[in-house]
Amino acid sequence: SSAASDVYKRQAIDSTLAAKIKAKKSTQYEYLVSELKEEKALNYDRLLMLNTFNFDIDNDEYIYPSGTSQANTNIDVYVVDTNPEVYVGDFITPYHESDGAYYGNTKGVFMKLLALPPHGLYMDLSCDITISSGTGSFQVEYQKMVGGVPSVGSVNGSHTSGLKAGSVYHYNEKGLVLVDPTKNESGKIGMVYRIYLNTEAGVRIKIENFKMSVYYMAKMQPERIDVIKPDVLLNRLLKSMNEENEGYVGEIEYQDDTRLSSTVIMAAESARGLDGAKIYTSFKNFSDWMEVVYGYVPDIAENKVVFKKRTSLFHSEVQKRISYTGMDFKVKVNSSLIYSLLRVGYDKQDYDSINGRDEFHFTNEYDTGITITDKALELISPLRADPYGIEFLVSKRGKDTTDNESDNDAFFVGAHLKENAECYELVREGYKVSGIISSSTIFNAMFSPRSIIEANKEYIGSFVKSLRFASSSGNSDIRINDVAENLDIELTDPLFTVSTLSISTADGGIPSDVNALVEVERNSLLYTCFINELKYKIGHYEGVDYNLQIKSIG
């Protein structure tokens, strides 16, 4: 959870609403999504996923068949499929000698093409080959019967004539094109693929370090998911904290962050498509999420909670000027505001899929360069934003398994509802993402860990001046709009400093705006400060005790 919300608070006047929030902020409530959802659902149009068939060699030594007088022959390389990770199927299938004829009875056949993957089909293949005498070649070939006539071709780049006795031939090709998405290759549907070696007579061949995979990108069918607007959830939480009575109002100043006006919340159970889906959350979770992701904090007054940009609570005009000559003048560094480490982002999730390695909505750590403490400032969102997490949940629709790890989680996504549209659509416009497999379909780029620092930069800049990227629990090779997610960051515009000033003054006049600046003049220095706390006794004229957070000294 966010430590920031506990770090620096102006002392709010304790209204009944403030007292209720204080008492019940951590209580977790559950609500039926059907009671809070938007009239129109999100059209979740899926992530492109990598699908991989891996093949291994069945036998690593091949001997030229004896008793033949041919000058050379084709020797089949037997391969078998192992550990496929197939997310969207029905394009290719492993296929072996017993599955049908290929040159009568060929053992080197390993797969058949059933349909054309829309983004192409590719192969990576590497191995080391030694031959006992003479020379030879190594080849991947495809064939199908068309009207009783075999149509045969060779995979470009897979043919090598470099085998010769006395040396190891290192074969290594990546991205061999089996189906080119830029061409009409419908004639390849039904092809079977085979690997063989062509050698002279009487040889022994050894193949080692064999690695082969065939892969393609594809996505599943779009699904509709119910979503909830942040202010609707906020008002439902206020009603729960008020014993199910109306009377309290929650508002969000959407206009100060364009990302927020296109944010919707999604329950994990909604992503799963479960009947009677519920969302589980608390006011603290909601508040921490708003603070971490958008830099918004709750402003509580009377019977209203307004979430607004933290910076808007620090007013720039000077409300009061004090010329101070008294003795009770204490400036000290508030050590609770000093950190050696900044953690930002989201809790790490474990996926059992190679695709999940691309996810970058996890935790980034930055070194502040401060060595006098080992404290960390954590800005970790309690709501999740990981696209792969949503994709894996949606892919479980129709399956009865429970995913205890994440069924109670809540997600949020950037989505907008265009005029007259029947669904919310994911926002991808304006965000160019690289360093990721599914760059064209990834979403939530606007909520990367780096964006959290941007949303809170004046606040974080009050404690540290520069952040050196240390590590990421996710994919740190990501670039968003050509900015690397793992760049160091300089912070130049702090809200305040880590020093406080305490004074007691006989001047009993209270500033009318407690969020405005107070200037204190002493010994020809001018201390410009925000009010942390002020104490005065109503009806007893004993002056005012100020606890001030210094913004600048000049």
Name what the model sees in each region.
Residues 176-199:
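Noncatalytic modules at the cell exterior or secretory-pathway interfaces
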Residues 98-101, 253-320, 327-554:
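An acidic/polar, Gly/Ser/Thr-rich interaction patch typically located in mid-to-C-terminal regions
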Residues 9-52, 56, 215-321:
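Charged- and aromatic-enriched interaction segments used to assemble
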Residues 152-181:
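Extracellular carbohydrate recognition and processing domains
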Residues 199-221:
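Proprotein-processing/basic-patch segments
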Residues 2-8:
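Short, small-residue-biased leader/transition segments that mark boundaries at the very start
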